[in-house]
Amino acid sequence: MLNLVQKIIGSRNDRFIKKVSKTVQKINSLEPEFEKLSDQELKAKTQEYKDRVAKGEALDNLLPEAFATVREAGKRTKNMRHYDVQLIGGIVLHQGKVAEMRTGEGKTLVATLPAYLNALTGNGVHVITVNDYLAKRDAELMSDIYEFLGLSVGVIVADLNPEQRRESYACDITYGTNNEFGFDYLRDNMAYDKEQQVQRSRNYVIIDEVDSILIDEARTPLIISGASDDSSEMYNLFNRLVPFLEKQEKEELDEDQEQKDFYVDEKSKNAYLTEKGYAKIESMLKKEGILEEDDNLYSPHNITKMHYLNACLRAHSLYQLNIDYIVRDQEIVIIDESTGRAMPGRRWSDGLHQAIEAKEGVKINAENQTMASITFQNFFKLYNKIAGMTGTADTEAFELHSIYGLEVIIIPTNKPLIRKDHHDEIYGSVREKFDAIVEDIKQRISKGQPVLVGTASIEASEVLSTLLKKKKIRHNVLNAKQHEKEASIIAMAGYPGNVTIATNMAGRGTDIILGGNLEVEIAQLEDPTPEEVAQIKAEWVKRNEVVKNAGGLCIIGSERHDSRRIDNQLRGRAARQGDPGESKFYLSMDDNLLRIFASQSMAERVKKGLKGGESLAFGFMSKVISKAQGKVESYHFDIRKNLLEYDNVVNTQRKVIYEQRQAFLDSDDVSEILADIRIDVAEQLFHDYVPAGSMHELWDLEGLEKALKSDFMIEIDLQKLYEEDDNLGEEDLKKFVREAIEFEFAEKTKNLEVGAVRQFEKFSLLQSLDSHWREHLSSIDHLRNSINLRGYAQKDPKNEYKKEAFELFSTMLDNFKYEVISSLAKIRIATEEETQRAQEEWKESMSEIKAEHESVIDNNQSEDDKEQEEAPKVQQVKREGPKIKRNDPCPCGSGKKYKQCHGKVVD
C-alpha cells in the first residue's frame, strides 16, 4: 500500500527535491547576468550581501544570489561549475540537513555554497573532516573561491600553537577535524586567561562524512586527563596469571560439561569468570602473596584487583594483534573497526589499554584521571545549526534524526548510476572464500579491469596478500600499517589491471579515477612541457577507455561488515560520475557477522549442504545477512543511545560549570560573587552546629568555635558572648558569625593593592572550581561503572544514576564554595606580580598538554580516550594555617574525617 501511495504522490525525498528545484531554476536564471560582471563587481557582491544581512535580510532570501555568486567564482578561479544537483546539495546543507551524495559527486565543492552564504553573518562557519590531511586538502582546494570573494579561510590541525589556532578560528570559514574542534572547546574551558581561549561562538557547522563522525565515533568521547598512580606491577602480575585460565566455548555453556574458568560474550566484548575460575585465580593470588589465606576476591577492598583481572582477561580473550590493534614503535596503536585506520593517541579505557601493553610486552603507561570530557553528540549540539554530507546515510536516517534532529535527503546523481551489484557468494570456510576471491581477481585483471578488495581486518588483508603473491599477482596493500602511502596508492588504484587491498575502507575521501589520477601524474613531473602534458593526457584517455571496456572498477568485499552502511561505502567507490563499475561480496559461514549473529542451526545446515569449494548465491541468504546486520545495527544503536542518556546527565552539569567558569573568567572583579558565597558558607556552617529553630541545649557552640578557628583563622568565644547577653538569639549569633568572616577578609586585604586582590580572588575561584570539577568527574566515572549493579536490587539504574549524579553535583558545588572561602582565609594573598607570574607558568604548562581520544569498548564504558599530562600546579600562594586534607581527622575533635564533618557541603 505504501509503495502504491509513493508511486502516486512521490516519497518525501522526491517532493523535497521537486520543491528546491524551483530555487535551482532561480539560480540558473541569474547565471547570464553574473557572467557579465567584472571580477571587481563580482567580489563587491560579498560586501553588498553582508550589508543586507546586517539590515535584517534573511539568508534564505539571499540564497539564489549568493549561490550564483559562488558558482561564478568557481568557474573563474577553479574552472569548476556547480552542477544543478550540487546546488540542491548546497540548499540541503544550508537548511541544516544531511545530504547523501554518491562518491565522486563533488561534496567538497558543494560545501562552498552554504559555507559562503552562512559566513555572511560574520559569525563564522566550521567545516569538519575526518583527518588532518583532508582538512588541509579541502581548505587549499577551495580557498581560491573564498578568497576571490573576499572571505578568509583557516585550517585547524594538530601541530598549531594557540595563537595560530585563534587566527584560524577568527577566519570566516575554518576547516579542521572533529577531534581538534572538540579538544579546543575543552581546553578553552580550562583556560585561566581569556587570551588563552582560541574559539569563538559555534554558529554553523558542515560535517563531511557525517555518518562516520556522528555515528561511528559517537561511542568515543573526547577526554583530557592527567596521569594517576603507577599500577604496572599489577597489570604484569595478572598478565602472567590469566593465560593459566581455561576458556569455555559458547556451545559448551548450555551443555552438561565440566565447568571451565571463564567464558566470553563477543557481542558486548566482555569476559566473565565462572565460580571455578574465581577459585583458581584466588589460589594463584594467594601463592603470589597478593591475597591472605582467609581473604577472597569478593571482599570490597579487593575491587581494584578485580579491575586488573577483568582488564587482562579481556585483553587476552577478546583483542587480537593486527585485528584490533598493532604494535608500532613499542606502543599499542588502536585500529578503527569502521575505517581500518591506525589511531595513534587513542587509548582504551577501564585499564584495557594497560592490559594489552602488558600482554605485548611494551611499556605500560599509567592510567589517567579525567580533567575534562565531552561526547561528540553533545559537542555538536552546541552549534546553532548542524549540516552534514556523506555517501551513505540513508540506512542511519532514523538515528541521525532521533539523536541530532537531522533529516537525510538523498541527492540525485549528476549522471545515472550504472554500477552492477552481483549477488553475494557464500562458502563453507574462510579458506575456500579466499581461494574464490583470488580466482575472481585473476580473471578480471586478465582483461584489464582494476580491482579494489575491501577486507575487515589487517590480518585478512595480509592473508589475501600472501595468496596473491603465490599466484604472482601484483597488488598494493592499504591498511593501518601503510597509512602514509594511502593517498598515492588510491590515486593509482584505477589503473588497468591494478589490484588494491584496503582494510575497512581506508582511503575514503579520495576518488578512484578510471585509468589513474591524471592530475597526480602531471603534478609528479618537474616543469613539464606542453608536449609532455599532452602525451600524458593521451595515454590516460587510452587507459580510461581500456578500463571502461573491461567493466570499470570492480569492488570485491571479503566479508560483510556489521553495518550495511560500511558495505555501501565500499560499493560506492565504484561507478563514480556515470562510469561503469561492479561490486560483489564473498562470505563464509565462519565470518564474524554470521558466526556471532546468525543462528547456529542455520549455519550447520548451510555447511552440511556445501561440498568443498561450492558456494551459495541466492535471495534467502541475503535475507539472513540483512537480518544479522539489522541485529548488529540495532545493538550498536542501543549502546549509543544508552551512552547519550547517561552523558546527558553530565552534560547538563558541564554546561552549568562551564557557564559559571566563563563568567568568572570574563569578570575583572569577582568580589561580589565571593561576598555572596561567604554569606552562603557562613549560614551553612552556623546551622551545622546550631540547627535552625532548635533549643539552646542542642547548640554546639564549642564545635562552631573550633570550625571557625581551623577553617577561617577566626578566634571567637561564642559561648561567652551568649552567656553575657541573655537576649542574644539564634539570628543574632548567625549575623555575628557572618560579620566575623566578612571582617576577617576585609582586614586581610585592606592594605593590599586592589588589583592584586581582585586578580588573586579570580585565580583562586578558577583553580578551586577546576579541582572540584575534576574530582567530580572521577566520582561520576566510578558511579557510572557500578550503577548497573542496582538492577539486581530491582532499581532502575538510569534513574538511580540521575539521582545520585545530582547529589554528587550538589555536594561538589557546596564543597567548592566552602573550600574557596576557607582557602582565602588561610593564605597570604600574593602580589599582583606573583599572581601574573603564576598565570604565565600555567600558560606554559597548558601549551604542553596533550589531548587524546580513547576508544570505548562496550556499553559499560561511557568514556574513552585519555591521555594528557596534568598541568603542574603553580605556587602563587603561601599558607598561614596548617593544611587540612579531606581524609584527615576533623580538627573539631568529633572523630570524623574532615570531609564528613566541617569539610562537608554547604548551600
From Swiss-Prot:
Entries under PROSITE patterns matching the protein: SECA (PS01312), SECA_MOTOR_DEAD (PS51196)
Cofactor: Zn(2+)
Biased composition (Basic residues): 896-907
Classification via SMART domains: SecA_DEAD, SecA_PP_bind
InterPro entries referenced in this protein's UniProt entry, alphabetically: Helicase_ATP-bd, Helicase_C-like, P-loop_NTPase, SEC_C_motif, SecA, SecA_CS, SecA_DEAD, SecA_motor_DEAD
Biased composition (Basic and acidic residues): 838-856, 869-888
Binding site for Zn(2+): 890, 892, 901-902
Membrane topology, record value: Peripheral membrane protein
UniProt cross-references to Pfam families, sorted A to Z: P-loop_SecA, SEC-C, SecA_DEAD, SecA_PP_bind, SecA_SW
Enzyme class: translocase
Principal cellular location given in the protein's record: membrane
Keyword match DNA repair: no
Transmembrane segments: none
Residues reported in the UniProt entry to bind ATP: 86, 104-108, 511
EC number assigned by the record: 7.4.2.8
Reactions the enzyme catalyzes: ATP + H2O + cellular proteinSide 1 = ADP + phosphate + cellular proteinSide 2
Note on how the cofactor is bound: May bind 1 zinc ion per subunit.
GO terms under biological process: intracellular protein transmembrane transport; protein import; protein targeting; protein transport by the Sec complex
Region (Disordered): 838-907
GO molecular function terms noted in the UniProt entry: ATP binding; metal ion binding; protein-exporting ATPase activity
Gene3D superfamilies tied to this protein: Helical scaffold and wing domains of SecA, P-loop containing nucleotide triphosphate hydrolases, SecA, preprotein cross-linking domain
Family recorded in the similarity comment: Belongs to the SecA family.
Function: Part of the Sec protein translocase complex. Interacts with the SecYEG preprotein conducting channel. Has a central role in coupling the hydrolysis of ATP to the transfer of proteins into and across the cell membrane, serving both as a receptor for the preprotein-SecB complex and as an ATP-driven molecular motor driving the stepwise translocation of polypeptide chains across the membrane.
NCBIfam families: PRK12904.1 (NF009538), secA (TIGR00963)
Subunit field text: Monomer and homodimer. Part of the essential Sec protein translocation apparatus which comprises SecA, SecYEG and auxiliary proteins SecDF-YajC and YidC.
Protein name: Protein translocase subunit SecA
Species: Francisella philomiragia subsp. philomiragia (strain ATCC 25017 / CCUG 19701 / FSC 153 / O#319-036)
